Amino acid sequence: MKSTLIIFFTLCLSMAVMARHESYYGNTKPAKLNEEKVTRVRFYLHDTLSGQNPTAVRIAHANLTGGSASPVGFGSLFVIDDPLTVGPEKHSKEIGNGQGMYVSGCKDLSKFTIVMYADLAFTAGKFNGSSISIFSRNPVAEEVGEREIAIVGGRGKFRMARGFVKVKTNKIDMKTGDAVLRYDATVYHY
């Protein structure tokens, strides 16, 4: 009888422990966040499609747009590893890189728009090891003033970031698609 009780309690305890560990979530607790901060950062993104060492490469292209005169024809998907610099000059101090993808999302070049996801990572200076993530529609043809793209996250010093980036085309070569863009980021973070 004694051994039967021991086995019974062992089985009950095992089942209770197993039931506890089958849950895929933990307890929900109220979050205590630090005070929210706002940081403004200006840098330049160099997007190069041409030459021996491009930083943006087409990885997919729809057959129906094969005859497009644009270097970034409708339906083209690009992967990027663009340098971020302090100034607009090609040899300006590099402070990071933007890695991600963009797709040409507009048939009409006069309304040229890309949809992009990128992680803008800082590799030097005060924000070394931190990044901001953008995921947004970028209406490139709307050059009156500045375009605005959304900041949807971040890491490091920009953990839980949100905000926006004002984008202004500093220089563009319409034949090659090469561009230098000024990014003025307003980042809300904790």
From Swiss-Prot:
Annotated signal peptide: 1-19
Keywords: Apoplast, Glycoprotein, Secreted, Signal
Glycosylation site positions: 63, 128
Any single biological process term in GO: phenylpropanoid biosynthetic process
Annotated InterPro entries: Allene_oxi_cyc_Dirigent (IPR044859), Dirigent (IPR004265)
Keyword Secreted set for record: yes
Location(s), subcellular: Secreted, Extracellular space, Apoplast
Keyword Secreted part of the UniProt annotation: yes
Pfam family membership, one: Dirigent
Major localization listed first in the record, in broad terms: secreted
GO cellular component: apoplast
The protein's assembly and partners: Homodimer.
Task of the protein: Dirigent proteins impart stereoselectivity on the phenoxy radical-coupling reaction, yielding optically active lignans from two molecules of coniferyl alcohol in the biosynthesis of lignans, flavonolignans, and alkaloids and thus plays a central role in plant secondary metabolism.
Similarity remark: Belongs to the plant dirigent protein family.
Protein name: Dirigent protein 15
